[in-house]
Amino acid sequence: MAYTLPQLPYAYDALEPHIDARTMEIHHTKHHQTYVDNANKALEGTEFADLPVEQLIQQLDRVPADKKGALRNNAGGHANHSMFWQIMGQGQGQNGANQPSGELLDAINSAFGSFDAFKQKFEDAAKTRFGSGWAWLVVKDGKLDVVSTANQDNPLMGEAIAGVSGTPILGVDVWEHAYYLNYQNRRPDYLAAFWNVVNWDEVSKRYAAAK
């Protein structure tokens, strides 16, 4: 079962002006496609070729040593981006405010004190991730936490590989290819804009499944 590039659940220009159409098209058809292609190449002839990518990245300790680096980077990239596209949309909040509601909002308030405090902690994790990587909202032991990972690592890989653990329910890509065309080196501006396109309905579904 070869991995395939997932279709976006919206048009490339759907997230404008916050994330521009050209960035979305290149990010999806070039960068993500490359991760898919390289993951498939590394998986050829292995017993792991039929695993869903989320399961594969949780079992990297079982992967042959000569495949581990390629799969950590490329299966990780495929998993990360597949989630990234899903947790974005045109903003779906109550009364026009793009923020979560219900159990997820209650859990955020419990874990971080307020939604604004959570946003600040998440942005700080993303801003201070040196070089390329991701910031994540994860569920761990039934509780929410904010973590970050380098390169294409994912919390599902576990602490031994990624340095953190948990089930991610929200993630933001801070590789420069995710924002450079529109924001150049202004990562904080990109992160501030990101909140306008988070699909909290999708994040809430992921929280309900992970808690």
UniProtKB/Swiss-Prot annotation:
Role played: Destroys superoxide anion radicals which are normally produced within the cells and which are toxic to biological systems.
Assembly and binders: Homodimer.
Cofactor descriptive note: Binds 1 Mn(2+) ion per subunit.
Annotated positions binding Mn(2+): H27, H81, D173, H177
Enzyme class (EC, first level): oxidoreductase
Protein's name according to its UniProt entry: Superoxide dismutase [Mn]
GO molecular function: metal ion binding; superoxide dismutase activity
Keywords (A to Z) from UniProt: Manganese, Metal-binding, Oxidoreductase
Gene Ontology BP term (one): removal of superoxide radicals
Required cofactor(s): Mn(2+)
